[in-house]
């Protein structure tokens, strides 16, 4: 048997990588309404729980509702040739999007929340 040859010397040198200054991509946190949905659920039905799938559905529903209200409000502002979105446009959008008693209840709760916020910030 012939003796094994040593591998040929390579002329390539190992290239050291320069230290990178790039930051690792942080995971983007998605904000949900889950804690608020849970608080309302416990106010209405203290002994009832909610599954993760149902919570995701409720979160999507709230996001969709807010998006529709914002879109309708912005259309009303543009239609009236104004530059400022006020509570009046939001109330009108709610009246257009929600049926009857639900719209009246939503408007009264919204007005109550705005009044509470205004009085606390003064």
Swiss-Prot record:
Task: Supply the InterPro entries for this chain.
Answer: Histone-fold (IPR009072), Histone_H2A/H2B/H3 (IPR007125), Histone_H2B (IPR000558), HISTONE_H2B_site (IPR055333)
Main localization of the protein described in the UniProt heading: nucleus
What does the UniProt record tell us about how this protein is modified after translation?
A: Acetylation occurs almost exclusively in the MAC. Monoubiquitination to form H2BK115ub1 gives a specific tag for epigenetic transcriptional activation and is also prerequisite for H3K4me and H3K79me formation.
Keyword check for Ubl conjugation: yes
Crosslinked residue numbers (Glycyl lysine isopeptide (Lys-Gly) (interchain with G-Cter in ubiquitin)): 116
- State the SUPFAM superfamilies in the record: Histone-fold
Q: Could you tell me the keywords of this UniProt record?
A: Acetylation, Chromosome, DNA-binding, Isopeptide bond, Methylation, Nucleosome core, Nucleus, Ubl conjugation
> Region Disordered: what ranges?
1-28
Q: Which GO terms describe its molecular function?
A: DNA binding; protein heterodimerization activity; structural constituent of chromatin
Keyword Nucleotidyltransferase found: no
Which residue pairs form cystines in this protein?
none
Where in or outside the cell?
Nucleus; Chromosome
Assigned GO CC terms = nucleosome; nucleus
State where composition is biased (Low complexity). 1-10
Recorded hits in SMART domains, A to Z, give:
H2B
PTM sites of type N6-acetyllysine:
5, 42
Q: Which residues carry this modification: N,N,N-trimethylalanine?
A: 2
Which PANTHER family does this UniProt record tie to the protein?
HISTONE H2B
Subunit annotation: The nucleosome is a histone octamer containing two molecules each of H2A, H2B, H3 and H4 assembled in one H3-H4 heterotetramer and two H2A-H2B heterodimers. The octamer wraps approximately 147 bp of DNA.
The record's function comment reads:
Core component of nucleosome. Nucleosomes wrap and compact DNA into chromatin, limiting DNA accessibility to the cellular machineries which require DNA as a template. Histones thereby play a central role in transcription regulation, DNA repair, DNA replication and chromosomal stability. DNA accessibility is regulated via a complex set of post-translational modifications of histones, also called histone code, and nucleosome remodeling.
Family of this protein: Belongs to the histone H2B family.
Q: What is this protein called?
A: Histone H2B.2
Query: What is the gene called?
Result: HTB2
């Amino acid at each position: 048997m012939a003796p094994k040859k040593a591998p040929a010397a390579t002329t390539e040198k190992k290239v050291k990588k320069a230290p990178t200054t790039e930051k690792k991509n942080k995971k983007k946190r998605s904000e949900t309404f889950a804690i608020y949905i849970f608080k309302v659920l416990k106010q209405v039905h203290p002994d009832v729980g909610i599954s993760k799938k149902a919570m995701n559905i409720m979160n999507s529903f709230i996001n969709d509702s807010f998006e529709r209200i914002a879109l309708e409000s912005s259309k009303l502002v543009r239609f009236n040739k104004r530059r400022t979105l006020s509570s009046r446009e939001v109330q009108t959008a709610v009246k257009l999007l929600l049926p009857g008693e639900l719209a009246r209840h939503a408007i009264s709760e919204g007005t109550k929340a705005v009044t509470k916020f205004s009085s606390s910030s003064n």
